[in-house]
């Protein structure tokens, strides 16, 4: 047996290929950090100015006052012009390049800020502000105040908190069947990070369920797998600076980007949950 045959049969070649790929990705991330940090350094003062809590609170208050509410298929809100335009643009700039997203799944990729070993300075600064100030200090209290009447009495009486969220990247070929999030979740919140020119069709689909769910759904629950019938009621368009917030019961949600969509299609959104405090704390320490 020659050297190459031995190498391939032992699996060493595949492991070597994986290591080379990992090194190439790390080098690409380092190059991106250097390039982006240099570009942002000259504009840092202007970028920081967009993280204005007072302006963001006013914008969220206005978005809530003008929000589209519907109780079909489950109580939900669509908030448009959620953030000041400059803040939204600065958050779009904070989305890291693709190499910062895990690549084990080519169509479904998630990033949690606390899991990033390296990131551009503005990515870390802006997403930390989103996670540590905007979501827990502005959005969560406002959304709870608006949606609390639709929570059951036992849940509504408990203190709630936001879970640590995730930045999501989806590509053509992605398909998520109608489902409900884990039962500990009271509200599911999606912040659309649509960029200029993104196809609005790749939004969130809301489904009715033919009867009340009577089986355990501690984990993510797919009604069709348990004999329930789901019927699509509407699609919340993937529009810039828009948030979708819905009650995690009574209906299901899904999403899809068809394989035939243009290859360059990318759908960015930030998802977080609002849950009773003990459940939210558990999510903070889970991977």
Task: Please annotate each region the language model reported.
Residues 96, 137-211:
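Non-heme Fe(II) oxygenase catalytic core, chiefly the N-lobe of the double-stranded beta-helix
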Residues 1-69:
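Fe(II)/2-oxoglutarate
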Residues 22, 26-33, 123-144, 218-229:
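N-terminal short leaders/motifs
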Residues 66-147:
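Non-heme Fe(II)/2-oxoglutarate
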Residues 2, 7-11, 15, 173, ...:
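Catalytic core of Fe(II)/2-oxoglutarate
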Residues 101-102, 188-190, 216:
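A short, polar/proline- and glycine-enriched secondary-structure boundary/capping micro-motif
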Residues 36, 46-48, 52, 91-92, ...:
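Short, Φ-rich (hydrophobic/aromatic) sequence segments
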């Amino acid at each position: 047996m020659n050297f190459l045959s031995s190498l391939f049969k032992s699996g060493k070649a595949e492991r070597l290929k994986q290591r080379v790929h990992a090194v190439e990705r790390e080098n690409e991330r380092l190059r991106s950090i250097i390039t982006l940090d240099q570009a942002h350094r000259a504009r840092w003062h202007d970028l920081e100015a967009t993280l204005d809590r007072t302006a963001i609170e006013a914008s969220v208050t206005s978005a809530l006052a003008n929000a589209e509410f519907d109780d079909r298929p489950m109580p939900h809100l669509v908030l448009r012009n959620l953030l000041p335009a400059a803040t939204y643009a600065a958050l779009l700039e904070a989305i890291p390049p693709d190499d910062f997203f895990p690549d084990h799944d080519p169509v479904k990729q998630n990033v949690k800020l606390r899991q990033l070993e390296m990131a551009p300075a503005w990515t870390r600064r802006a997403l930390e502000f989103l996670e540590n100030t905007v979501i827990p200090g502005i959005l969560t209290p406002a959304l709870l105040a608006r949606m609390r009447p639709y929570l059951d009495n036992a849940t509504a009486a408990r203190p709630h908190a936001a879970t640590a969220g995730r930045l999501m990247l989806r590509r053509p070929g992605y398909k998520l069947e109608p489902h409900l999030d884990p039962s500990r979740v009271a509200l599911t919140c999606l912040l659309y990070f649509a960029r200029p020119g993104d196809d609005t069709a790749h939004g969130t689909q809301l489904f009715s369920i033919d009867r009340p769910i009577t089986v355990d759904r501690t984990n993510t629950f797919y009604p069709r797998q348990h004999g329930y019938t789901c019927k699509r009621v509407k699609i919340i368009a993937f529009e810039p600076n828009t948030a979708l917030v819905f009650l995690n019961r009574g209906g299901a949600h899904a999403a899809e980007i068809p394989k035939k969509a243009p290859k360059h299609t990318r759908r960015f959104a930030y998802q977080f949950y609002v849950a009773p405090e003990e459940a939210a704390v558990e999510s903070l320490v889970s991977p």
